[in-house]
Every structure is written in C-alpha cells, then in structure tokens.
C-alpha cells in the first residue's frame, strides 16, 4: 500500500480553500450577461470556447493533491446542480465559494464547525421555503422565451425557438438539439410518431422525387416476429386488397420469400404495401410495438399471447391518416387509437419514468411519452465555424434545461435578486447558540454573491449595486446588460425557481462538509525510481564505445 501524506487543521483547510478558489475563479467569470468566455485546450482538435460553468469545472485538475481535493468538491456542486436542473452551475459554484470562504474565516476565529454547519443548513431550509413562496408559475410562451433567452446568455433567437418548439410539441414533448447545416438556427417539428427505421426495400418507394413511401389511410399490421413465409400473410393481404387500402407492415423483420412477394405485389399494383422493421431491441421493441398499437387502435400479433399471423383479421390491424417512410425513418400521422387508451398508456409510462433508476432509461421512456402525446421538435443550431457551433449548442442545451425547469417549478426574479430578497426575509432567523447564528449569517452573506459576481463581470462596483438593490423591494433589481435598475420581471430577466433552489441546496451541502473538515489524506507523490546499485559492476562496458 502506498505511503500517505496527511494534513490536519488549518494546514488542510488552507490548501483546500486554495483549490476551491482556483476552480471557482475560473468558473465565475462566465456568470451574467457580460460574463466572459473560457477557452479549454483539448488533447486533439481545436480548443473549445464555452460560457457553461460545468464544462469549465470538469476540465480542471490541479497538480497539488490537497488543493485538487478542494477543487473536486466544488466540481461536485456544479455537476449536481447540472444533473438536477440542467443549469445554474455557475451560480452554484459562486455560492459554494462564498459559503466556504466565509465559513472557514469563522472556523479560524474559533467557532465550532458543526454548529456553523447547522446554522447554514437552517438558513438554507428557510430560504428554500421563501423561494417557493416567491415563485410564479411559468406557463405562457412569452415567459418561456424570456427564461430561454437569459439562460442562453441573452440570445433572443434561442429563447423564441425554444418557446415555439414547446408550443408545437407541448411541455412534455421531446425537444432535441442538433448541428445545423446553415448559418441560421432552424426548428423542425415532426408531428405524430416517428421512429428510426426505414423501408426494407427501395421498391416500395412511390414518391421518387422525395425518395419516400407515402401511404394515405393505410392499415397497419404489427407483428412481434420475423416474417419469412408469405403463406402466413395471405389471409391479411387478401382482406386488405378487398378493402382497397394500402398496408404498412411493422415487424421484427420481413425477409426472403415474404419480402420478395410484397415487392412484386406492389410493383404490379395489386396491393400497395410497405414493410419496415420494428424500432428498438428486446423488451424495448415489444413496448414500442405496443405504443404503436395504442396509437393506431391495432393489436400486436404476438405468439407470446397465443395470436397467429394466419388468423389475423382487419379488426387486428391499426389505422392512421397517413404514414411516411424514408430511408431511415417512419412517421405515423394521426393514428385512430382512442384518446382514453393513449392517455392510459402515457400514464403507465410516466409511472415507469418515476421508478427508473438510470438516466438512459428515463430518457428513452420520456421519448416514448412524447411520441405518444405530441411529437418531436428538433432545434438545428447554425454557426459559421465548428468552434462556434459547439459553444452555441452548449448554450441552447442549457436554455432548454432551464425552460423545462421553469415550467416544472415556476420562475423568480433573475440577476441574483431572488436570493437577496430571500436573505432579507429570513434575516431575523436565529439558531440555538451564537455559533449557529454565525452560520446563518454566513449563508445570508453568501446569498448576495451571485448578484455581486454578475455586477463585477459587468465592470461595475458590486457593493454599490448590492446596496441599491437591497434598498428596493419585490422584483426591483439591476439589469447588468443595460446597466439600469428596475423591475426584473418587466425586463424579462427570470430564473427558474428549480435552478436557484438546486444551486443553493447543493452549494450549502458540499460547502458545509468542507467547513467541518479537520484532516486530509492523500497518496504521497511517487519519488524517482530507485538507483539500481546491483548493475554498478557493469560500468566497464562503457569502453565498448571504441568498438563502433
């Protein structure tokens, strides 16, 4: 086992604080409308330019192991805030730095660290309750656009795009961010259910100009099995041909003789057919087939429940107003499934989302809800260079998370004003002893830090602006972008309550643990390799140089 280096008391805390400050100072320059960029070097490719706090934090590793421990703990604050609300990482880092700095001063002055932590925790619990009381629901497009704009560093086009996307696909809809091809940002909305499987044969194409299969009012056959024998399908094909409607087959696979016969029938015009593979794999495929069945009012033909393809009738088939199949995607528009059945299925999936343990599962389930409930919107980010594209895409992602958080828990006045108002409301809070009172004061003072940092980044004097804001009430604050005072809600400067709440809770949680640290242990740096004394007798070989 490697030898350890151990530091105690003040020595440990000073080192830890230095690490906290290095990381926080790098992150906090990005805060606010006049925040600066940070350039991150990559081991390959061009450097990344970002204003995203968590991206900066993740890049920082310090050489001194004790300092690095401090930095890593603040990195945890940024990551947790990012996981919980998708934004507010810089605010969380600034809050954590302020609490740690003030808290360690109090510890150095002889206060009891555990009581300080209890005081900080008490203040945060009270502050969270006050934040909830200040929160205003965020339901209209204008407010959603404002939240998106602020989170995307005052880029109005991003805010408007996100609001438009939410209008089109609903608050629960899936909105994804992709690289665009031009200079402008674009919004693509896919109505209906789309999945990433295309036609099994190009001979099904009936729109050569677009290279797509478009079928109006088709029947939809859903089979949880491979179809290779055409005999199994003859009864269904004959019934569909009599009905004079097209047929879409969605199955695990359609191959060999079955696929060849379908192609021949289509080309001869006997019956219009298109076949695609079912989306997903394993249990997820079964679930998605069931989703499509619910949406189209059909039944999944599955041998697991004793259904055979030969015995399928028109009643077992789903229907939709239109189906469009491309090389890579299939879109089902206006399925005829009953609204009550669709809502029941959505509720069932939402229950699974609550119980899901992995982010991946949660994301996939959320996609299924969106496909059933509304549709999918894709924001295509346009930029002149790849470096700009990466930076802008990160901002759009942040803005998207912020708007979702705003819809979930409402909004409060932005620009650090909400925390200043909350601190004023709980100023009379007291603990069980003097040390706890100091802890409460530490937390209250830290709540001003985001406002001060925004002002500092804008090149103004933080103390002057903070005093002016504290002299006002309600939503009165300072707009750092235009350098004027007024109502933050009227200025359109809003922060999602969830983002502010998460930032404060995670910052206080980690900072409280750091204040109560008394000892730090790390591996000793490995020394130089030991001198191989045994090889000393071979020195005479140096003379071999003359033989060259």
Swiss-Prot record:
Q: Is Iron one of the keywords?
A: no
Q: Which CDD domains does the record match to this protein?
A: GroEL
Compartments, as annotated in UniProt: Cytoplasm
- What GO CC annotations are associated with the protein? cytoplasm
Task: List the InterPro entries.
Answer: Chaperonin_Cpn60_CS (IPR018370), Cpn60/GroEL (IPR001844), Cpn60/GroEL/TCP-1 (IPR002423), GroEL-like_apical_dom_sf (IPR027409), GROEL-like_equatorial_sf (IPR027413), TCP-1-like_intermed_sf (IPR027410)
| Binding annotation for ATP | 30-33, 51, 87-91, 415, 479-481, 495
Q: Which domain of life is it from?
A: Bacteria
The UniProt record lists the keyword Chaperone: yes
Alphabetical GO biological process terms: biological process involved in symbiotic interaction; protein refolding
Q: What is its EC number?
A: 5.6.1.7
Q: Name the enzyme's class.
A: isomerase
**What GO molecular function annotation could you give as one example from this UniProt entry?**
ATP binding
Instruction: List, alphabetically, the Gene3D superfamilies matched.
Output: GroEL, GroEL-like equatorial domain, TCP-1-like chaperonin intermediate domain
User: What is the reaction catalyzed?
Assistant: ATP + H2O + a folded polypeptide = ADP + phosphate + an unfolded polypeptide
Keywords attached to this entry: ATP-binding, Chaperone, Cytoplasm, Isomerase, Nucleotide-binding
Pfam families this protein is in? Cpn60_TCP1 (PF00118)
Q: Which PROSITE patterns match?
A: CHAPERONINS_CPN60
Function comment:
Together with its co-chaperonin GroES, plays an essential role in assisting protein folding. The GroEL-GroES system forms a nano-cage that allows encapsulation of the non-native substrate proteins and provides a physical environment optimized to promote and accelerate protein folding.
What does the annotation say about its assembly with partners? Forms a cylinder of 14 subunits composed of two heptameric rings stacked back-to-back. Interacts with the co-chaperonin GroES.
Q: Which family does it belong to?
A: Belongs to the chaperonin (HSP60) family.
Q: Tell me the protein's name.
A: Chaperonin GroEL
């Amino acid at each position: 086992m490697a030898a350890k280096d151990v530091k105690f008391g003040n020595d440990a805390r000073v080192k830890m604080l230095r690490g906290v400050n290095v990381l926080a100072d790098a992150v906090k320059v990005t805060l606010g409308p006049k925040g600066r960029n940070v350039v991150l070097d990559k081991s390959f490719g061009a450097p990344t330019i970002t204003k995203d706090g968590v991206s900066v934090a993740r890049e920082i590793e310090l050489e001194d192991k004790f300092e690095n421990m401090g930095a890593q703990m603040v990195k945890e604050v940024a990551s947790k805030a990012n996981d919980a609300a998708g934004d507010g990482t810089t605010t969380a880092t600034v809050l954590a730095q302020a609490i740690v700095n003030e808290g360690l001063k109090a510890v150095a002055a002889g206060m009891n660290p555990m009581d300080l932590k209890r005081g900080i925790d008490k203040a945060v619990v009270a502050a969270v309750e006050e934040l909830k009381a200040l929160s205003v629901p965020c339901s209209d497009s204008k407010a959603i656009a404002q939240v998106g704009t602020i989170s995307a560093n005052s880029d109005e086009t991003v805010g408007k795009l996100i609001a438009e996307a939410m209008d089109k696909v609903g608050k629960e809809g899936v909105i994804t961010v992709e690289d665009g091809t031009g200079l402008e940002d674009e919004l693509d909305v896919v109505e209906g259910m789309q999945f990433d499987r295309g036609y099994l044969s190009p001979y099904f194409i009936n729109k050569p100009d677009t290279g797509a299969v478009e079928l109006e009012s088709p029947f939809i056959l859903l089979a949880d099995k491979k179809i290779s024998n055409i005999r199994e399908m003859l009864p269904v094909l004959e019934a569909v041909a009599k009905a004079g409607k097209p047929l879409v087959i969605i199955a695990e696979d359609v191959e060999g003789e079955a696929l060849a016969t379908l192609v021949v029938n289509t080309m001869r015009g006997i019956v219009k057919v298109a076949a695609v593979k079912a989306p997903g794999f394993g249990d997820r495929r079964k679930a998605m087939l069931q989703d499509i069945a619910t949406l189209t009012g059909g039944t999944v033909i599955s041998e697991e429940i004793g259904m055979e393809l030969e015995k399928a009738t028109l009643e077992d088939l789903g229907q939709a107003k239109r189906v469009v199949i491309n090389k890579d995607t299939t879109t089902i528009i206006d399925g005829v499934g009953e609204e009550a059945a669709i809502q029941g299925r959505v509720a069932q999936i939402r229950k699974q989302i609550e119980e899901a343990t992995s982010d991946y599962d949660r994301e996939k389930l959320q996609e299924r809800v969106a496909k059933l409930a509304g549709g999918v919107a894709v924001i295509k980010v346009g930029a002149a260079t790849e470096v700009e594209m990466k930076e802008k895409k990160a901002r759009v992602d942040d803005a998207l998370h912020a708007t979702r958080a705003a819809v979930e828990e409402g909004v409060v006045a932005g620009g650090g004003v909400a925390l200043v108002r909350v601190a004023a409301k709980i100023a009379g809070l007291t603990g069980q002893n003097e040390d706890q009172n100091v802890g409460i004061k530490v937390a209250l003072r830290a709540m001003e830090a985001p406002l001060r940092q925004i002002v500092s980044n804008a090149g103004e004097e933080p103390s002057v602006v903070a005093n002016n804001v504290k002299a006002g009430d309600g939503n009165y604050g300072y707009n750092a972008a235009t350098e004027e005072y007024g109502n933050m809600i009227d200025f359109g400067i809003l922060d999602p309550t969830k983002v502010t709440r998460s930032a404060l809770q995670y910052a206080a949680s980690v900072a409280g643990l750091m204040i109560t640290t008394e000892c730090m242990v790390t591996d000793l740096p490995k020394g130089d390799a030991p001198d191989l004394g045994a090889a000393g007798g071979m020195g005479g070989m140096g003379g071999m140089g003359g033989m060259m």
